[in-house]
């Protein structure tokens, strides 16, 4: 009885192209505790992610604090490479697709979608526009993301935890989203496999054979600033009683996934 031929080059388990996740950014807004930043870096690195951005952390030197270094364990390189920004708009300036992670639904916020669907959407966007970046945005430990921060994103996702006790710490939430991204990069899920989880349909332009480059976060913010000034100038927007016009306009245009030439 002959033995089966051995593979000349065994396929490593759970191997994925590192470039598939290299342009995924995790953004932490207003983080208070250095240990959480370190634990976040560790959670990211275990799933092959390395791009960490901090917006107005409580401590400017948070990444070099002993508690952060200790919780990062073997992921101190992710801490060392972390970038700090004064505002979320600055952190998303070169990002063309952003997902807000929040347990609370927000009025006039972006369309909601399950974590695995957001992961699939993000990597699909990178497949069409490999020169771009996508981001997952997390809020402060005690307060989460503000309404204004959520409204800057294209999708909103939440983790379906137990309603009896749904409190996740920051690093746990990051670990789950990072896992969803890695699983998608390994080919473990598909957007089409979860139609019941989807609350939106992609515009036709996103499945075009030659899609136009998506607008960056900076370009989109400039578009909204110009639009607001124009509406004020013609008297359509009352500065004393703006109501919900601009949040509605923001949601409308972000849902359309604007291209660079459209803004």
Ranges and model annotations:
Residues 1-263:
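Post-transcriptional modification and biogenesis factors for structured RNAs
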């Amino acid at each position: 009885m002959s033995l089966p031929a051995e593979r000349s080059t065994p396929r490593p388990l759970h191997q994925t192209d590192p470039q598939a996740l290299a342009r995924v950014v995790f953004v932490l807004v207003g983080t208070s505790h250095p240990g959480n930043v370190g634990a976040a870096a560790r959670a990211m690195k275990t799933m092959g992610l390395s791009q960490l951005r901090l917006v107005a952390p409580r401590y400017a030197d948070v990444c070099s604090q002993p508690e952060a270094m200790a919780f990062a364990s073997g992921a101190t390189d992710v801490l060392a490479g972390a970038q700090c920004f004064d505002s979320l708009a600055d952190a998303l300036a070169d990002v063309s697709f952003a997902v807000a992670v929040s347990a609370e639904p927000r009025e006039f916020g972006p369309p909601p979608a399950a974590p695995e669907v957001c992961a699939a959407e993000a990597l699909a966007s990178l497949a069409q526009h490999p020169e771009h970046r996508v981001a997952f945005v997390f809020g402060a430990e005690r307060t989460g993301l503000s309404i204004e921060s959520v409204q800057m994103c294209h999708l909103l996702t939440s983790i379906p935890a137990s309603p009896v006790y749904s409190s996740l710490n920051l690093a746990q939430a990051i670990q789950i989203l990072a896992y969803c991204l890695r699983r998608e990069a390994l080919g473990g899920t598909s957007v089409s496999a979860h139609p019941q989880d989807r609350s939106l349909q992609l515009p036709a332009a996103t499945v075009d054979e030659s899609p136009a480059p998506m607008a960056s976060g900076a370009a989109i913010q400039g578009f909204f600033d110009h639009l607001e000034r124009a509406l004020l100038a013609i008297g359509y927007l009352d500065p004393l009683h703006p109501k919900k016009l601009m949040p509605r306009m923001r949601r409308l245009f972000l849902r359309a996934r604007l291209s660079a030439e459209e803004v």
